[in-house]
A protein has these predicted regions:
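Short amphipathic alpha-helical segment within the helicase RecA-like ATPase core
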Residues: 1-155
Length: 155
């Protein structure tokens, strides 16, 4: 008998006009550029949330920032622009793996990634899948780390 929770489900959905925060168990992944400009679209209507996220981008200098607020949990990810040197498929796959590693043990089961470009979504999804693979079948001492992440949605 197979355990369905060991598989990571990846869905691609149509982007909505506003950020849907009805899912309390979801982490919203938003991208911003190296010049601290928010790249993810679809939530500018909420001015308070938009300014809150922009302030967190400016304050934190790291590439991955987890922000919790009353409107939800957000992972702010710094990434290169398509025209930048080093923006390759390998870069996006590593970015996806780093996103997975940042979120795998924080207790949320759903991740919503806000990126409109299909090719970028494809490479990030591959990176998430590669990052989610564990070698537990080949280890003598199995890890006790609990992974709760089981659903990734690209919007």
């Amino acid at each position: 008998m197979q355990d369905d929770n060991r598989f990571l489900k990846i869905n691609f959905e149509e982007p909505k006009n506003s950020l849907n925060q009805n899912t309390m168990d979801a982490v919203h992944v938003l991208f911003y550029s190296e010049k601290n400009v928010l790249l993810s679209q679809g939530f500018q209507e909420d001015k308070i949330l938009s300014s809150f996220l922009k302030n967190n981008i400016i304050i934190n200098s790291s590439n991955y920032v987890i922000v919790r607020s009353e409107t939800g949990t957000f992972l702010l990810v710094r990434r290169k622009l398509q025209k930048d040197v080093g923006f390759t498929s390998n870069y996006l796959e590593e970015l996806g793996g780093n996103i997975y590693n940042s979120l795998k043990s924080i207790g949320h089961s759903i991740v919503k990634i806000y990126e409109e470009e299909a090719e970028i979504n494809l490479r990030i999804a591959l990176g998430i899948l590669l990052g989610s693979y564990n070698f537990s079948n080949y280890k003598k001492n199995k890890s006790k780390e609990k992974n709760t992440l089981n659903n990734v949605i690209f919007l």
